[in-house]
Amino acid sequence: YIFSGSALNQPAVASTSDIINGTGAQAGLTQIINERQQADLGATGMGRLSVSTSGSTVTLNQDGTPFGFQLTGVTSGLNGATVTGPSGSPPTISMALGSNPNDGDTISFQLTLPDGSTQTIALQATSSATPGNGQFSIGATQSATATNLQNALTSAITNLAQTTLPAASAMEAGNNFFSDPPQIVVPGAGNNYATATSLTNGTAANTVIWYTGEDSATPARQTQSAVVAPSTTIDYGMRANETAITNLIKNTAVLAATSYLPTNSNAQATYQALSQKLEGNLSPPSGTQTIADIESDIANAQTTVTNATKLNTQTQTTLSDILNNVDGVNQTQVGEQILTLQNSLSASMSVTARLAQLSLVNYLAPVSG
């Protein structure tokens, strides 16, 4: 199991079935997505937002939980309107119509979705009594116009909550499930996820822990090493929970775990939104580990192995040549050389012996009397 770090005999991940469907009391990704979608949609089906009107003032409210849409901005081009927010806790946006807007005036609301993506709802004032999509009618009074604006904003939010929001919820549920530890929704009263207000850490008792390999503080590459030459060691370990690999598994799992009922008229729009998000995730943000980074690390190790193999081959060839020179000596020729050397040595030793017997007295003449 090469993606298990140092635990080569241990599977790197839980089974596909367990990850997607769960097992026993352990929730799989499908359940985590379903619970997150309920929590983000909310009890009213408006993604945890609400719109109210008082006289000629329209107020857009966020419920203050970590679920659903988050109000992040508003841009107004409505004539005579005083627009403030988002401000307060929980955030609200207030639109006070001091006079009726002009035909064609617009107002835009910026929303952040659970997965961190953003959406803009743009509404345009129209003098027509039958406004089109993304429009609201200018009434006879500011109060009537405010009611029309409320209705148009409510419709736009509801449509977004039924189409794009479920896709964002699925993506964020994937982030929750594949985090360490996993994050799960705490249901509201009566086990109602639509009224949930918080997340908590999942455990092995209630959530499938998808990564089952070794997970120490040691860098992944250093979990497996090999000596390929004297003073040369390569690192080639890998873990399935590395950022790039996790991202790939997560996106694939989210697509596999997301299903749509035939009776859901918004299924196609939701699927398209999810597909766009998954496609965008194929290009991670700058500075984030990619599959190419891991490939580069392994390729560098492979290059080191290749170079070491060449060096080892050259060394083996040299040693083989030396061994062949030793093993390939002509024994007859060596014998003749040894005999010649022995004869020379014997002659030398004979001369040396004779020289050792010489004495000065042998060369002195007798002294006459």
Predicted regions and their residues:
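Short acidic, Pro/Gly- and aromatic-enriched capping/linker segments at domain boundaries
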Residues: 207-228
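Polar, low-complexity tracts enriched in small residues
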Residues: 119-149, 153, 160, 226-306
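Extracellular structured ligand-interaction cores
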Residues: 104-106, 221-223, 233
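Extended, beta-strand-rich, solvent-exposed assembly scaffolds of outer structural proteins
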Residues: 47-203, 209-212
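Amphipathic heptad-repeat coiled-coil/leucine-zipper-like oligomerization helices
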Residues: 1-77
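Amphipathic alpha-helical polymerization modules
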Residues: 1-17, 144, 158, 257-369
